[in-house]
Each structure stands twice: as structure tokens, then as C-alpha cells.
């Protein structure tokens, strides 16, 4: 969906099935690094959690490969839906050589949860400093030793050593920003303006939906998927129609 708004080149870490499907596409370089997707980070066995971490570590391989090719990298989890282009002011920040990384806070307003799972979400970030990545990888490899939540929690410690920028709330919009009594009212800020989804007074850029594969338990974010799909159905936006056709 990002390609509806921006010209993109991709490096993806994937399994054999995805490799066969995507490696023939001109602007995608596939790294066949994933052996199994029998993994999870929530309600899972220890073996599944270990497999989850193996998958998570492959994203660092993809990021480093992309940085070697292009000098910087915007990383995205595969379950992102872009509904507006990245704003020009943010594009200017991404190209600023004085900023080492751009990262996304969870913004749950639920401090005990963030103390456990991390202040930042690891599903979207931009990086240009290889030392940033090296430190993140080193801490992630030792996540059990330090009691970190997989590769995600180390991010909040690494960013302290660099010039980092927090992307605003209209980026990487996940269900966790709406799921407490104190934050549920944020759903009312999602609305249609000029046939586009807005989050308050800013265009909603992308949603992190957790919906592209079966997960074996209740998808706690289904309410957000339903919300954005219902909003898209009320518009005449051709890009949204393509997203809905893909999902349904």
C-alpha cells in the first residue's frame, strides 16, 4: 500500500514460499532467512517464542542489506496499511543526515504495559546510522540475559545514545493506542476528510493491523481493522477500494 503513494525499493526477509512469489518482482530483493513461521510472542510455547525471536532478528539482516545499498532504510512490518502518503515534513526529516533514527512510541498511556513490552514499537522505524543498528542487534541477541521483551524493548535503550526523532501519533497507528478506557475515545478522532482518513487534524498515514495471518487466539486489534475498513467503505477513494479488494 505504500507504493500507492511513493516509489519504493524493497529488501525483505522471508521464507521459501514468499521467496518464490516475490523474488521475481523487479523492485524486491528477497533474503530467504526464515525457516518457520510457527512462532508467536504472546500466548506461545517457549519453542514458538524462540522461533519468533529468530524471525525478528532477520529484519536486522534486511535493514543492514538495504542500508548497504541505499545508505538509509525505512523498516516496515508486513502488516501495515498505508492510507495516506508520508507527509513532506516527515520526508524532510527522514532525509536529514543529522538524525540517526526515526522511531515510533507505542503511545498507550498504559505505563505498566510499556514497562513490560517497551516504550517503542519495533514494527516501523527509519535508520541511517549503522552504529545504531549494531547496538540494537547486540542488545537483542542478549535479550534473555537482560530480561528484555524480545528485540523491541532494547530499542528504548539504544535510542538514548543517538539523535532520534519520534514520529507523531498519525504514523504506525496500532490497536494498542485505543484499547484502554482512557484511550478508547481516540477512535472518535478517526474520520473522513476530503475522502481520506484523518486522525484528529492530521492525515492518518499508516495502520499496524496484526491481521495478515492466523494467530491462534483472539486478534485484540480486530476492532481497529473493522473501524478503518468501515471508514474506507464510505469514500470514493480509489486507493482505498484496492485495499478493500485485497482484504476481502
Residue positions per predicted region:
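Amphipathic alpha-helical segments that form well-ordered structural scaffolds
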Residues: 1, 5, 62, 151-158
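N-terminal anchoring/stem segment of glycosyltransferases
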Residues: 1-45, 68-70, 224, 230, ...
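Extracellular/periplasmic catalytic domains that process cell-envelope and extracellular macromolecules
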Residues: 95, 117-119, 197-202
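A recurrent flexible, glycine/aromatic-enriched loop bordering the glycosyltransferase active site
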Residues: 111-124, 147
Amino acid at each position: 500500500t505504500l507504493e500507492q503513494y511513493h516509489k519504493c525499493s524493497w529488501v525483505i526477509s522471508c521464507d521459501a514460499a514468499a521467496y518464490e512469489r516475490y523474488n521475481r518482482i523487479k523492485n524486491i530483493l528477497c533474503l530467504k532467512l526464515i525457516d518457520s513461521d510457527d512462532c508467536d510472542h504472546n500466548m506461545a510455547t517457549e519453542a514458538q517464542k524462540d522461533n519468533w525471536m529468530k524471525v525478528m532478528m532477520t529484519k536486522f539482516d534486511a535493514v543492514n542489506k538495504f542500508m548497504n545499498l541505499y545508505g538509509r532504510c525505512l523498516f516496515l512490518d508486513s502488516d501495515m496499511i498505508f492510507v495516506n502518503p508520508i507527509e513532506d515534513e516527515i520526508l524532510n526529516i527522514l532525509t536529514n543526515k543529522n538524525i540517526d533514527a526515526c522511531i515510533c512510541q507505542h503511545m498507550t498511556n498504559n505505563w505498566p504495559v510499556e514497562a513490560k513490552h517497551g516504550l517503542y514499537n519495533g514494527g516501523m522505524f527509519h535508520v541511517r546510522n549503522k552504529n545504531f543498528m549494531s547496538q540494537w542487534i547486540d542488545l537483542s541477541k542478549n535479550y534473555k540475559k537482560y530480561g528484555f521483551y524480545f528485540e523491541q524493548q532494547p530499542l528504548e535503550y539504544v535510542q538514548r545514545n543517538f539523535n532520534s526523532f519520534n514520529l507523531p501519533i498519525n504514523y504506525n497507528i496500532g490497536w494498542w493506542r485505543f484499547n484502554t478506557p482512557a484511550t478508547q475515545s481516540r477512535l472518535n478522532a478517526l474520520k473522513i476528510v476530503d475522502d481520506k482518513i484523518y486522525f484528529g487534524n492530521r492525515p492518518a498515514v499508516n495502520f499496524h493491523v496484526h491481521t495478515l495471518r492466523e494467530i491462534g487466539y483472539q486478534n485484540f486489534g480486530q476492532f481497529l481493522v473493522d473501524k478503518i475498513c468501515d471508514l474506507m467503505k464510505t469514500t470514493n477513494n480509489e486507493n482505498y477500494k484496492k485495499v478493500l479488494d485485497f482484504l476481502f
